[in-house]
C-alpha cells in the first residue's frame, strides 16, 4: 500500500481556471454559471440578508449575547475533521474574531454521505453527544456549516454526467437531513474535493478519490448550487416550505497536483502534504495546516462570513473572558474520548500511525504491549503536541495481536 506520488498532475484544468470553456463538451468552468467564480448578485444579496440576521443562541435556542453562540460546524468524514480541528487551533492566535462565534468539528468518522439521512439517528446522535455536547453546545445553536463529502457506494470512472446527477441527489438528501436535525441552520458552504491523483489503488475508497472522480466532484458541487439558484423546489432555502439551508461555495480546493492553478497558485504536494498510508485522501500535519489556513483565510475574508466570523461592535458583550473562537479562558480540562484517537492501518503490517483529533495540553505517553504484557515500544511526548500525527514501526516484531496504550495526563486509552 502506497501513495501514487508519480501521478502528480493530470492535465485537467481546475474548475476555477476553466472559465467559459467546457469540460467534456457539457460542463462549463467557473464556480458559478456563466464561467465565473463569483456568485450571481441576486443570490449573494439574499445570502447577505440571511447572515445579517445571525444572532448568538443559547442551548435552548434563545438569543443571548452574554452566553449564546453562533456555531460554525464542519460536516463530512475524517477528511473534514482533521483540517477543521487544525483551523480551530489556529483561531486561538487571533484576537480579532467574533467572540460570540464557536467553530466545532462535527464530522463523523468514516461514514459516507449516504449516512446523512433523516432517521439515521445513530449518525446524528454521535455528533450531538461527542462533538457538540462536549463543548457545552446543542444542535439548535448550529447556524452555519462547511460541508465536504461524497458517496462511497457510487462508482465513477470517466463518465461525469450520471455521477454528477447522482451526487447532487445525495447532497440534497444530506442537506435536508442537516436542516431537520439543525433547525436553525441558515447557511452551508460546500467545497469540492482536492486533488485525488495520489490515491492508493489498494484502498477501498480508491474509486471515490482517484482522478477524475475528485475533479468530477467539483462539478457536482457547482451543479448543486446552480440548481438551488435556479429554483429547484427540493433545494428551497426560504419559508414557507424550506427544505435545505442557503448554499454557496466554500473555498475551492482542487488543483492539478503540483501544477499551480491560475486562480491563486494552489498546489498539492504528495511527499509533504499527504499521509504515507492515508490512501491519498488523509493529509499529514503539514497538509492539514495548509487546508486549515485556506479555511481560516476564507472565513476571515468572504463576503458572507466576515460579518459574523470577525469581531465587531455588535459582538462586544460576548468578549469578556473568552478566546477568539468563543471558548472560555481557562476552561475545564477538555474531555478526550476514544473517538478522538485514530490508529491506522489496523490491522497493520508493522508500520502504523496515530492521529490525535483534539488539543492535548497534558503529557502523552504511548506504549505498545504484546499479548503476554511485555512493552515492545514506548514513547513520551510533552504537553505541547496538539493535533500530532505519529508514526510507529514494529517491523521485525513477531506477527500477532498488540495493544496500543496511550496515557494523556492520568487518563488511559487502549486499543488492540
Predicted regions and their residues:
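N-terminal secretory targeting modules
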Residues: 1-75, 79-89, 307-326
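Conserved SGNH/GDSL esterase-like catalytic core that processes O-acyl groups on lipids
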Residues: 24-42, 66-162
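A Trp-anchored, charged/polar loop motif used as the substrate-binding/catalytic surface
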Residues: 49-60, 118-137, 166-176
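Sec-exported extracytoplasmic/periplasmic mature domains
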Residues: 80, 88-92, 132, 150, ...
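Extracytoplasmic/secreted proteins, especially bacterial periplasmic and envelope-associated proteins
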Residues: 82, 86-89, 162, 166-173, ...
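Catalytic His-Asp segment of secreted/periplasmic serine-dependent ester chemistry enzymes
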Residues: 195-326
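C-terminal outer-membrane/trafficking sorting elements
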Residues: 335-344, 348-416
Amino acid at each position: 500500500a502506497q501513495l501514487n506520488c508519480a501521478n502528480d498532475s493530470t492535465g485537467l484544468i481546475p474548475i476555477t481556471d476553466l472559465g467559459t470553456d467546457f469540460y467534456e463538451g457539457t460542463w462549463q468552468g467557473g464556480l458559478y454559471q456563466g464561467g465565473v467564480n463569483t456568485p450571481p448578485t441576486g443570490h449573494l444579496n439574499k445570502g447577505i440578508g440571511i447572515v445579517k440576521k445571525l444572532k448568538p443562541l443559547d442551548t435552548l435556542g434563545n438569543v443571548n449575547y452574554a452566553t449564546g453562540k453562533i456555531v460554525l460546524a464542519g460536516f463530512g468524514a475524517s477528511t473534514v475533521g482533521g483540517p477543521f480541528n487544525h483551523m480551530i487551533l489556529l483561531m486561538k492566535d487571533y484576537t480579532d474574531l467574533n467572540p460570540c462565534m464557536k467553530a466545532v468539528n462535527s464530522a463523523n468518522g468514516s461514514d459516507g454521505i449516504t449516512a446523512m439521512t433523516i432517521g439515521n439517528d445513530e449518525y446524528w446522535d454521535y455528533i450531538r453527544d461527542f462533538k457538540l455536547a462536549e463543548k457545552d453546545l446543542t444542535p439548535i445553536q448550529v447556524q452555519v456549516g462547511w460541508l465536504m463529502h461524497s458517496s462511497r457506494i457510487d462508482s465513477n470512472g470517466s463518465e461525469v454526467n450520471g455521477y454528477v446527477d447522482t451526487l447532487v441527489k445525495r447532497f440534497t438528501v444530506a442537506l435536508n437531513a442537516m436542516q431537520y436535525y439543525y433547525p436553525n441552520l441558515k447557511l452551508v458552504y460546500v467545497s469540492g474535493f482536492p486533488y485525488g491523483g495520489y490515491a492508493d489503488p489498494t484502498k477501498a475508497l480508491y474509486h471515490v478519490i482517484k482522478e477524475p472522480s475528485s475533479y468530477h466532484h467539483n462539478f457536482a458541487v457547482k451543479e448543486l448550487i446552480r440548481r438551488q439558484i435556479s429554483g429547484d423546489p427540493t433545494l428551497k432555502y426560504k419559508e414557507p416550505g424550506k427544505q435545505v439551508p442557503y448554499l454557496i461555495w466554500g473555498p475551492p480546493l482542487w488543483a492539478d497536483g503540483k501544477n499551480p492553478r491560475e486562480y491563486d497558485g494552489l498546489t498539492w504536494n504528495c511527499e509533504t502534504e499527504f499521509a504515507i498510508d492515508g490512501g491519498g485522501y488523509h493529509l499529514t500535519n503539514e497538509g492539514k495546516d495548509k487546508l486549515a489556513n485556506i479555511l481560516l483565510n476564507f472565513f476571515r475574508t468572504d463576503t458572507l462570513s466576515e460579518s459574523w466570523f470577525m469581531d465587531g461592535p455588535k459582538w462586544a458583550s460576548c468578549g469578556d473572558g473568552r478566546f477568539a473562537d468563543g471558548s472560555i479562558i481557562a476552561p475545564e480540562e477538555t474531555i478526550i474520548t476514544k473517538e478522538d484517537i485514530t490508529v491506522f492501518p489496523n490491522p497493520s503490517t508493522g508500520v502504523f500511525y496515530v492521529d490525535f483529533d483534539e488539543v492535548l495540553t497534558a503529557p502523552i505517553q504511548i506504549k505498545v504491549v504484546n499479548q503476554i504484557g511485555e512493552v515492545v515500544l514506548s514513547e513520551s511526548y510533552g504537553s505541547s503536541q496538539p493535533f500530532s500525527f505519529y508514526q510507529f514501526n514494529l517491523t521485525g516484531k513477531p506477527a500477532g495481536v498488540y495493544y496500543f496504550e496511550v496515557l494523556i495526563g492520568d487518563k488511559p486509552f487502549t486499543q488492540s
